[in-house]
Amino acid sequence: MEKLSMVTSLLCAITVAVLAVAVVSGEAAVVEHTFVVHEMNATHLCNTTKIYVVNGQFPGPTVDVMEGDTVVVHVINKLPFGLTIHWHGVRQMRSCWADGAGFVTECPIPPGNEHTYRFNVTGQVGTLWWHAHVTCLRATINGAFIVRPRDGKYPFPTPAKDVPIIIGEWWELDLIELDRRMMDGNFDDNPLSATINGKLGDLSNCSRMVEESFILDVKHGESYLLRVINTALFSEYYFRVAGHTFTVVGADGNYLTPFKTDMVTVAPGEAIDVIMVADAPPAHYHMIALANQPPEPDPQIPVFTSRGLVRYAGATANNNGLPVPMPIMPNQHNTMPSYYFHANLTGLAHPERHRVPMHVDERLFVTLGLGSICRGQNTTCKRRRSPETIVVATMNNVSFAHPKTTALLERYYDGTSKGVYTEDFPIRPPRPFNYTNRDLIPPGPLEEALEPTFKATKLKRFKYNTSVEIIFQSTTLMQSDSNPMHLHGYDVFLLAQGLGNFNAKRDVRKFNYHNPQLRNTVQVPRGGWAAIRFVTDNPGMWYLHCHFEFHIIMGMATAFIVEDGPTPETSLPPPPPEFKRCGNNGLSQP
């Protein structure tokens, strides 16, 4: 945890209170927190950087609740610009107003203002997380959101302790400047290091000053529930502990069939629960978080690594004079371990589990790609070959135009959407093509032939209780990227994933209808596809986007409108009294 300056510490001592009101019983409780969001200086790698944090912490405070509790978080914005807080993976049943998606469900909280989020957590158990949902602020404004079973029982032996393992990135570049640069089409900036729970690790150093590592203290023979969360803006990560194995037991707030592995792969937005038994000889063991990279000759980025330590009780300070074991990591250019890890996970079948909808009312085939548009009002530029173009990310050739002064949910609820958005998001690409043809890697004549791309705020409307199937198809237009697609307000059945082009005649037979994973973030593999289904049982405005930050900024997003059901209990209620409408609220965005 970064240390505050003396002035900030005094300010926090006077003004910051973190309240946790819980009833130690079987009854639901109200869990209350106050988040003060502010700037803070932090020094790493011989440089002092201004970062943005909650309550002086990086990562921020953990929200720890039981299933069925009501969560109340008071956010006080001391930043010079607006922000929102998104409760990543919380289903927000009939509480879309509290989802915290900037300019989708609410306008950002203006500087110097406060906002209260209030929602219930029902039907979910496991690890979720929270983060800022405007610009690139989630790189440092984030934290774990833990939902415990109300009866205290797990479908696996109760661990001695559970520990969030929050994998992130350390940016020397100011995050607001990073956002501005990406908005202008500059995607060449990179973080300096990976982090584990805010620590860069002892592989990072400058002038022989070694960075601090995260240390996990364990006792021999005990088991530990590691809640591995990827908060990074840019990279998927491999995570390993030397001399130890894991049993994967959950993901995104849902239980999984226990799966044994010696490495966890976690994409941006994902939360993976694993059990680690401390069964090695008592000593010290290194843990590694390594960012994977696309295979060469695709565009390369620096290798980001953070090294931590598992320290057994009773082990000597110098590890008995022996070298500390290092885990053997895969080649950072090898993306196949990620594919096999995700493809081997299945949901834990139990009587109360929701069933996969076998009948499909609406089908979408969504290609994930790149395109280019003309800058400003210019409409005559020659696409990629002109300096007047800007590269954008697309879904079915549409790059999402994010609102800048209003919230989509507010306009939908008030019936004032004209001129703000349209409801014609395409359910398939303009024309089929060989989506994984390597000759499509841009720039090139084949890629240019697939233009034009449209920049627009196009949404998709669904009636209540509609069964929806979506096939996400990655394309080589994305060059080398996988795509962790996150849908707000829903858990979706991940029926299957595959490599190459999706072929219904061949691939539908691979669908897992018995025990698929329930996920809020679905990893669409590089050069492959993923199939999901869900039922629109949660009315409101729900954001769908890739969780790579540069893909969001480039426009790989849309929103789903889910209409009210036939009864008050199946309809979106009016905004709560504490909800602040957009209007003339002094909004100041970076």
Curated annotation (Swiss-Prot):
Gene name of this polypeptide: LAC19
Signal peptide: 1-28
Keyword Signal attached: yes
Annotated glycan sites: N41, N47, N120, N205, N344, N378, N397, N434, N465
Biological process annotations from GO: lignin catabolic process
Protein name in UniProt: Putative laccase-19
EC numbers, comma separated: 1.10.3.2
Enzyme class: oxidoreductase
Chain residues that bind Cu cation 4: N483, C546, H551, M556
Binding-site list for Cu cation 2: H88, H131, H547
Residues at which Cu cation 3 binds: H133, H488, H545
Region (Disordered): 565-590
GO CC field: apoplast
Cofactor comment: Binds 4 Cu cations per monomer.
Organism the protein comes from: Oryza sativa subsp. indica (Rice)
Domain Plastocyanin-like: 36-152, 161-315, 424-566
Reaction equations catalysed: 4 hydroquinone + O2 = 4 benzosemiquinone + 2 H2O
GO molecular function terms noted in the UniProt entry: copper ion binding; hydroquinone:oxygen oxidoreductase activity
